[in-house]
């Protein structure tokens, strides 16, 4: 397999962690970074991370880029993606991680700039034109002839979808309500301030448990159409830096038991969803999952059963690191299918 050449647009939390997740992969070469922040600051933020620790690579700065273990990655600062030098840099795929260009029109500017494909590291605002693909759930639907732009959805959808898939495949999921207890993110202020769309979201992140909306549960239907109209959810933002947890309360079509649900999750975690869905029956807490690469880790000791058709299950996820690893996995699965189609 020829090396996949990747550009990153937006070197924030996810952009940097995608690079960390892929930098030592022999099948990936990062060829460019676009961010309005100067290269020396980008290199500093890549090297030192308060949550995930120091990068175990040598990181240096040049005027026009950063050097990681001797490999030079050019950095540019261009506001309009259509003007980026992806063609000149040889970028095959671009990870769109600014959070700004999440529809077809915005993301397609990277194609105009010379990239072959775009992976949006966020839910798309244009689901009818941009396919949502989740590794382990529906990534095999990638069509090299049509899918020039794809979305990797959100970290929460990546956590919920494998759980929902196992439940639905084995017992039938008739309806469900999800709550994600979600770590702080960069959109939240450190102290109280105005927030135009969501007043509660403007309150100090480190001081409060903040109820919030999320489209993550409904978005599961984009990758599991059979669950359309059966799931919705909400979020609580909590004062922790990383690792979140999904709580799904649901009804099943088939009468079953919590023990049988746990058995189905364990089987999937060791089989069809190995590496995507994890399983634990230990007495764990959130920090135990920091640095975990799974999309979702089912917690057998945390779920409950009301009756043979009504249950609650709990699944953990490192909302930064797990998600960033899925972006890398998605790119590699896409290019592999692309190369097979070309033979």
From Swiss-Prot:
It catalyses: D-glyceraldehyde 3-phosphate + phosphate + NAD(+) = (2R)-3-phospho-glyceroyl phosphate + NADH + H(+). One of its GO terms (cellular component) is cytoplasm. The record marks 182 as: Activates thiol group during catalysis. Pathway: Carbohydrate degradation; glycolysis; pyruvate from D-glyceraldehyde 3-phosphate: step 1/5. NAD(+) binds at residues 13-14, 35, 79, 121, 319. It is an enzyme of class 1 (oxidoreductase). Gene3D superfamilies: Dihydrodipicolinate Reductase, domain 2, NAD(P)-binding Rossmann-like Domain. Keywords: Cytoplasm, Glycolysis, NAD, Nucleotide-binding, Oxidoreductase. It is found in: Cytoplasm. GO terms for molecular function: glyceraldehyde-3-phosphate dehydrogenase (NAD+) (phosphorylating) activity; NAD binding; NADP binding. Belongs to the glyceraldehyde-3-phosphate dehydrogenase family. Catalyzes the oxidative phosphorylation of glyceraldehyde 3-phosphate (G3P) to 1,3-bisphosphoglycerate (BPG) using the cofactor NAD. The first reaction step involves the formation of a hemiacetal intermediate between G3P and a cysteine residue, and this hemiacetal intermediate is then oxidized to a thioester, with concomitant reduction of NAD to NADH. The reduced NADH is then exchanged with the second NAD, and the thioester is attacked by a nucleophilic inorganic phosphate to produce BPG. Homotetramer. PANTHER family: GLYCERALDEHYDE 3-PHOSPHATE DEHYDROGENASE (PTHR10836), GLYCERALDEHYDE-3-PHOSPHATE DEHYDROGENASE-RELATED (PTHR10836:SF76). No significant Gap1 activity is detected in cells under different growth conditions. Gap3 is certainly the main GAPDH present in cells. This is Glyceraldehyde-3-phosphate dehydrogenase 1.
């Amino acid at each position: 397999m020829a090396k996949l050449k990747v550009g990153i647009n937006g070197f924030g939390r996810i952009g940097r962690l995608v690079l960390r997740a892929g930098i030592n992969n022999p099948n990936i070469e990062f060829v460019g970074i676009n961010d309005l922040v100067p290269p020396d600051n980008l290199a500093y933020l890549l090297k030192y991370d308060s949550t995930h620790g120091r990068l175990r690579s040598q990181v240096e700065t040049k005027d026009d880029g950063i050097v990681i273990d001797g490999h030079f990655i050019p950095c540019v600062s261009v506001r309009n993606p259509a003007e980026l030098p992806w063609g000149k840099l040889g970028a095959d795929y671009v990870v769109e991680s600014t959070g700004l260009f999440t529809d077809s029109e915005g993301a397609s500017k990277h194609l105009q700039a010379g990239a072959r494909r775009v992976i949006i590291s966020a839910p798309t605002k244009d689901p009818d034109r941009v396919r949502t693909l989740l590794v382990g759930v529906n990534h095999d639907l990638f069509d090299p002839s049509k899918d020039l732009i794809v979305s990797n959805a959100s970290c929460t959808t990546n956590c919920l979808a494998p759980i929902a898939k196992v439940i639905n495949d084995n017992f039938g999921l008739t309806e469900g309500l999800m709550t994600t207890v979600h770590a702080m993110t960069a959109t939240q202020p450190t102290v109280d301030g105005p927030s135009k769309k969501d007043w509660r979201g403007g309150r100090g992140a480190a001081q409060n448990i903040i109820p919030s909306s999320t489209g993550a549960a409904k978005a599961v239907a984009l990758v599991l159409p059979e669950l359309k109209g059966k799931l919705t959810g909400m979020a609580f933002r909590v004062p922790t830096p990383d690792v979140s947890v999904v709580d799904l309360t649901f009804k099943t079509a088939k009468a079953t038991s919590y023990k049988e649900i746990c058995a189905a999750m364990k089987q999937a975690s060791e089989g069809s969803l190995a590496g995507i869905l994890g399983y634990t029956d230990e007495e764990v807490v959130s920090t135990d999952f920091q640095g975990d690469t799974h999309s979702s880790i089912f917690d057998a000791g945390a779920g409950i059963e009301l009756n043979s058709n009504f249950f609650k299950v709990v699944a953990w996820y490192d909302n930064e690191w797990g998600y960033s690893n899925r972006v890398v996995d998605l790119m590699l699965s896409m290019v592999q299918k692309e190369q097979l189609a070309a033979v």
